[in-house]
UniProtKB/Swiss-Prot annotation:
This is Dipeptidyl-peptidase 5. The keyword Phosphoprotein does not apply. Residues 1-19 form the signal peptide. Its EC number is 3.4.14.-. Its main location: secreted. Keywords: Cytoplasm, Glycoprotein, Hydrolase, Nucleus, Protease, Secreted, Serine protease, Signal.
């Protein structure tokens, strides 16, 4: 056990000196502008977005709504509010709606007129508003917005009583509040003005007494519903099933004239991204066929309202789109624009609903969002490993792409590259290599191997403020971020291959990746390697710790990882996850849980390890981190435990994130110095 004095010494040396800081570091990353998705007006000549900047001097965000001109590429700030702005939605070509939180228990929908730079409140609501959809017919508008119904919340007692699951989800206890969809109506007073008046007395809760909740917790939002003047389509969990053991969500339709509700989908898995076509007759969505499997392939379905016919589009396509939007492609061909992971990038595709062709539209970087105006160009929100979110447009006829608004932080395109190396079972494994901006090929650099979570996830060419490879690279490391067996974007069979095999093929792929580093990267100092991972990546850190590969690393970092696979099932909230990946419950298939249980190999643990966990992480509870730290301390292995009391599975708050980066970088820098890695000279 380390002395208090040594702990204080570590705290003092933890902060890098100004001389040691790279031009791009954790602080500059966290203070860089954070942009929302850009939203084009119907005409396609203007876009709006929200930009936030965090100041470590003031310890607060400054947020504003900006207008981007497509022809001039100029952008200007329209609104600055200390309060939260969100849900930007154009109502005409020169006016948009947005939601603003007034306090913890109320919010407003406001209209902003771009022509005269004026705003006014359209509607006040007694809860937070998250997203807005608009439908129009003959200057009459129907607004559907998502909000929270708190009418069933019991208070002011701090006692929770439960008769069913979920007890808690992601980072909060189930208190009885529910997500729902509300409906109001507006009238446009004159044809050529942006003056609207509300024509409904109060918002109608469209899901009241249905037993349905939408958007779906914990990450549901605008993608969970769509509406026009006559219809609302949305997804919700099947109320007849246990939400903690089943992934099934259903696509529903509500007739906004009669309020009639009907279900459209029959899939046993999750459905998402319901979208209404302009003709009002066709509805598309994504659906998974496998129950209890959140990473099953998303398949595109199209439903025709008049006939009730449903068909599976592009059945041959072996990718899993995350979102879809209706639109028109070359020559006026109708279809769907889909974003899907593909070989380490998020690519925009066009999917023909008639010919079932799938055509890639973008090549570089990653697309996170698209906006589809009436013009021939789509507005894209993109990012890369070196660029925070920026905006571009792409012509659907020529596929020519141009940048509308850059977002540079001074990182060079030559600082990263992608490679492939031979993996298990004949698979080729993809990895990103990120180098310091001051890279000199004649020198040798320590190596940081990054292992992603999921496990059905991937390292894509996109920006992150949580795990940003460029931050590690510019602290002096060669970053090797690989996608082992189970990763997404390489075909569904590759993704599915990790089931029942958490510590098998993925571990071997990482071993082969380390061999690739040794044999092919002349500038990599393979004697000074560290490995870091979060969630499943944290599981893999603890698994590596108990196996031979662990001795090839000077230090390890485990963020919100798994220590005991059995306890993980019993303590988590989404039980279906372990049920799928381990082939049942622990009492049904204990042999698989035990086979891949890191706690069964603690006798072999020996490498210094930093353990990080958060108290509001209900996906992998903090007892997993404490258990790992207990073992490390009992065995006398150099170790450190970092606990965030106010964070969940992710460390989001900027000041916490800065501390996270300082702790992690100090740990791996210490153990890759020119000293005996087993010496505990700092701590």
């Amino acid at each position: 056990m380390h002395s208090l004095f040594k702990q204080l010494v570590f705290f003092l040396v933890m902060t890098l000196t100004a001389a040691d800081k790279a031009a791009f570091d954790a602080e500059s990353m966290l203070e860089a502008p954070r942009r929302s998705a850009v939203v084009s007006n119907p005409l396609g000549n203007l876009g709006i977005f929200i930009e936030s900047n965090y100041s470590f001097a003031d310890h607060k965000y400054n947020s504003g709504i900006y207008l981007l001109n497509e022809s001039t590429r100029n952008h200007q700030e329209l609104l600055v509010h200390g309060k939260s702005n969100k849900a930007l939605t154009w109502i005409t070509d020169s006016a948009f709606l947005y939601a603003r939180e007034d306090n913890s228990s109320s919010s407003s929908i406001l209209l902003f007129d771009v022509n005269n730079r004026s705003e006014r409140i359209i509607y006040n609501h007694n809860s937070s508003i998250s997203d807005i959809r608009i439908g129009e017919k003959n200057n009459h508008y129907r607004i559907v917005f998502s909000s929270v119904d708190n009418s069933l919340v019991k208070g002011p007692s701090n006692v929770h009583v439960y008769d069913h699951l979920f007890v808690r989800h992601w980072d909060r206890w189930n208190t009885g509040s529910r997500n729902t969809l509300y409906f109001i109506e507006l009238d446009k007073k004159t044809e050529n003005s942006n003056y609207f008046e509300i024509s409904s007395e109060k918002a109608i809760d469209l899901l009241k007494e249905t037993g349905l909740e939408s958007p779906v917790e914990p990450f549901g939002g605008l993608s969970d519903f769509d509406s026009n003047y006559d219809k609302l389509v949305f997804v919700a969990k099947d109320p007849k099933l246990n939400p903690a053991t089943q992934t099934k969500t259903v696509v529903y339709e509500i007739n906004l004239n009669t309020r009639n509700l009907k279900s459209l989908s029959t899939a046993k898995g999750a459905c998402s991204s319901p979208r209404l076509a302009k003709d009002g007759n066709h509805i598309a969505w994504l659906e998974m066929q496998t129950p209890q499997y959140e990473s099953d392939q998303n398949q595109i379905m199209v439903y025709e309202s008049e006939s009730g016919a449903k068909k599976h589009i592009a059945r041959h396509w072996d990718r899993s789109p995350s979102s879809i939007e209706w639109g028109v492609f070359k020559g006026g061909e109708p279809g769907l624009f889909a974003i899907a992971e593909n070989y380490g990038k998020q690519i925009l595709f066009f999917v023909s609903i008639f010919h079932h062709q799938v055509i890639p539209m973008t090549e570089e970087h990653s697309v996170s969002s698209i906006s589809v105006p009436k013009s021939s160009s789509l507005w894209l929100t993109k990012s890369s490993l070196i660029n925070p979110p920026y905006y571009a447009k792409i012509n659907v006829e020529t596929l020519n792409e141009s940048v509308l608004l850059e977002n540079n932080v001074g990182l060079s395109p030559t600082s990263y590259e992608e490679i492939w190396f031979p993996g298990t079972h004949g698979h080729r494994i993809h990895a990103w290599i990120v180098k310091p901006e001051s890279f000199d090929k004649s020198k040798k650099y320590p190596v940081a191997v990054l292992i992603h979570g999921g496990p059905q996830g991937s390292w894509t060419d996109s920006w992150s403020t949580r795990w940003n490879p460029a931050v590690f690279a510019n602290a002096g490391f060669i970053v090797f971020a690989l996608d082992p067996t189970g990763s997404t974007g390489y075909g569904q069979r590759f993704t599915d291959s990790i089931a029942l095999d958490w510590g098998g093929k993925p571990y071997k792929d990482i071993e082969l990746g380390v061999e690739y580093i040794k044999n092919h990267l002349s500038y990599a100092d393979s004697e000074k390697m560290v490995a870091l991972g979060a969630s499943y990546g944290g599981y893999m850190i603890n698994w590596i710790q108990g196996h031979p590969l662990g001795r090839q690393f000077r230090a390890l970092v485990c963020h919100d990882g798994v220590f005991n696979t059995l306890n993980t099932f019993y303590n988590t909230e989404e039980l279906y996850f372990s049920i799928h990946d381990f082939g049942g419950t622990p009492w049904e298939n204990r042999v698989i849980y035990e086979r891949w249980n890191p706690s069964n190999f603690v006798n072999y643990w020996a490498t210094p390890e930093l353990v990080i966990h958060s108290s509001k992480d209900y996906r992998l509870t903090e007892s997993e981190g404490i258990a790992a730290f207990n073992v490390l301390q009992y065995k006398g292995i150099p170790s450190r435990l970092l606990v965030f009391e106010d964070e969940n599975h992710w460390v989001i708050k900027p000041d916490n994130s800065l501390r996270w980066h300082k702790e992690v970088l100090s740990w791996i820098l210490h153990y890759t110095k020119d000293c005996n890695a087993n010496e505990d000279e700092t701590f």
